[in-house]
Amino acid sequence: MAYNASLFDVNRILKSQQLIEDGIQLESSLLQICINVIFSFTVLLIFCIIRPKYPVIYESKRTLCKSETQRPDALGKGWFSWIKPTFNIKDDTLIQYSRLDAFTFIYFVRMLKRLIIIMTIGSMAILLPVNIVTALNTGDWPPASILGFITTPSFYTSDQSDKSKIWYWCPTIAIWLYSILIVGHMIMASKSFLRLRKKYHTMLTKDSHRIEDAVSRTLLLYVNEPSKTTIERDKIKCLVHQFSNTPSQRIATGSYNQHLTYLVQKYTSIVNKLEKSLVAYLSKAKKDQNDDGAAEELDTFKRPIIKLGWWHQIKVDAIDYYTDQALTLSQSIKRNRNQLQNADHLFAIYADTYSAHQAYVSLLNKTTEQHALIQKVALAPHPKDIIWKNMTLDHDTRKLKRLFGHGLFLSSIFLASFPIAIVASLSNLINILRFFHKTRRTIANNRVILGVIQSYFTPWFMFFLFLISISLLRYITQQQGYRTKSMLEQKTLIRVFAFFVIDYLFIFTVFGVLIGILGQMTIMARLLHRERTTMLSRYVFQMGKNIIGICIHWINYICINCVGLAFQLLRPLALIKDKQDVSDFDFTKNYAMVLSIFVATLFSSAIVPIILPFALFYFGFATMVFKYELMYVYTVKVDTYGKTWPVLYCIILCSVIAFQLMMILVLSLKGALFQVYSLIPLPLLTCFPLVLHGKYLYRKIHPLQLELNNDDNDSTEPKETNNPTPNDDRSARWIEKIYRDPVIRRPLIKPCIPEEYRLLIPQVYKHHRQHQLILKELFQMKSRKKSSRTNTINTTRKSKEEESERVYYVDPIDSYYDGPSSSSNSTEPSAPDLEMILAESPLPAYVSPKEQTL
């Protein structure tokens, strides 16, 4: 009788504490939902009002993008005229204006939205009613609060019978169905994506086909030591010819200078600052006087001043200072371009794709067995995708950087557990207060404040912490020496996912549950005069109930992310800075945010199914926002042709496995052993499609050229290369040009001064001792259509010194340059795209692999 009485007291105390927690949690959650709804609608209304007034910011892709193929049609001037065009954007239109990577992102978000729709319908129609019926027939009735009707772990008390455990089969079946649904949907979506990707390649222009054909004909080879002499270079070339089935047309040795990267970055920054100072100075003079007057009395206007030194005590003329810096850096860059060293990589160019792939297979087998000089053979990545500053890293340095990066990543996971523990404590602030004596009245008198801290400020803190974590993990990954941007982004995304699962789901849940159970057991031990350890060991079942609070926290997190989407649409930082340029869409960050919402929803779907409607609203809103941004605001400079899809597939299936393991843990805490046994095979079964279909996707997508070769060129034969034509040699020389480091071959940018101010430039520098040199080096008064760089490309080679100083038309998208400054209208063109090379140095007419066989 004493035991029953004690057990009755325990249940009564737990129920009273749960009633207080659920009441505060429900009130605060409703309050934060109302605040976020009002906040989001206010931000959206502000966006609708100011959008027509600032087309440079909210339609920057249309107003500032130089590429005709990526410039969309103009939107209307009405407040809500952006909604219908964005909603009606078709996939073909999105691919045309934003390339395949943008479509891949929208396709992935839409796929997750479809999954959430199916899960929401099933949960609202089956799982939620079953939870209510189960709570009515077993456990505490009436429930402590409305949360007891809709959550799974609130079914039962500690004295539940084996007969009542039959109700656990409902969430168990839901776990099986969710797993089958997600895995099957991912496989079908992957097959559809491969078909769309193949269709996209057929939609490419002829110039794009030529570029892809040129890239597919090139192999990238790494040697153990850079060749320092002509004899060593010839030896490597002979080895490549010997081990290949067909001789290569050309072999280009990589070259570099260790100082050029820093010099070019510094030069670009100085030129942008010089441009801003000049435009501000000349526009002020132009505003007060006409053209003639301004030219005559330009010296009367105050020139811009900057402060230098540790304490900013030295004042100098900003225009003269930046000009001298730019001139010095320009001359230093020219000198360093004449002092190049051979790198440990080279590019072998073949006559056609078939010959290149046959040589790749042959070199891959023979070099590892017969000769150790050639260290690695790979298909050459696209020039836009290469991180050139990492191409010159030797094998030992790259290996050391990889190990150091792995150590930093593991350290970041450990260090991030401390702020995550603080977040978990703030989300359980009531139980933290229960550790202290006489806090019951404090909790009762400050319900609103405690609820707002738990349900509103804590999710915001987690949201900003996650954004900081993404930037930190990207920085760590950048230090590991990956050679391509696509690989860098994929590795960053994988690490962000692992970081989120370990810290934000596992550690946050463990800390939250432990703090909750310790706080409740502290009150119980104090009231029943027992040891807290005895209470904790006997009433472990209460941990299952405390998981509900963690799941409710993710509902608040989803609402905060909806507000974040509204601010992402408003772009307040760009509005404040008056930033007038076309930014690149941050795929890694947005993928990470979308995946965090989906994974958190999946983890809570079987416990708190009410989270699914909130996730459905988020994905619907996210689809709208991201479509608008990709269509009208951001550009996609580097198109990897959907290489991220295999990584996304593996991440989703890994999240399914983690969800299954967590539910096994929750059910084991509730004592549902038969249900746990039925779930044990599920993670093992999920591993099969993860491994098998993941490898299939990787073979299909990495690289694009292999897929096209296997599908279309099974019967093709290599072209005769014994007597190469002039067009073939010209094409090989062009490929060699685009596979040179941009800091070596790219023209230096010039200050972009509006045409009405350019006549005043000589007056600005008439007092300078290097007046003529400045006008010649930094301000080329030539038209935009006929640049001196065009004549440079078309001229013949004269000498080795001229060749080293020559600058070529190359693709402007690389990691060294920020692009042309946007503080004024551009009159000095930046280096053109690869398509512009084709227009000025035309390659032979493109012939498809199928036509080559005819």
Map each language-model feature to its residues:
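Transmembrane transport/permeation module of multi-pass membrane proteins
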Residues: 2-789, 797-800, 808-813, 818-830, ...
